[in-house]
């Protein structure tokens, strides 16, 4: 349904990383939709549903960091929850060629090199030990 009001178009939380990216493209930012997806993922109790939430590949964007980050999110959530790692996360386009440290964390490089979960580190994305933390997380 086409609507002129963007907030109406996103009344529900995204239930896939593809939906995160598609919604984010429409409003110009992905972070809030990723947080909503994580809340939805963490409250879902059925492992099959969780696996389906990670299975659908988000289209590649013009932002290689975002493409790699979404793959790291999917792989990390799959590993943490004993789910199969989606094949799409292993594509070369889902890996960075140069290390990336989020802005404002330059002074923490040494710590981030050690703490970054494997799914992020192997894509050369260096983040804290629990990059997908959400206060309401159940898993």
Describe every region a protein language model picked out.
Residues 2-85:
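Charged, helix-prone or intrinsically disordered regulatory segments positioned adjacent to compact structured domains
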Residues 81-139:
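Charge-dense, extended regions
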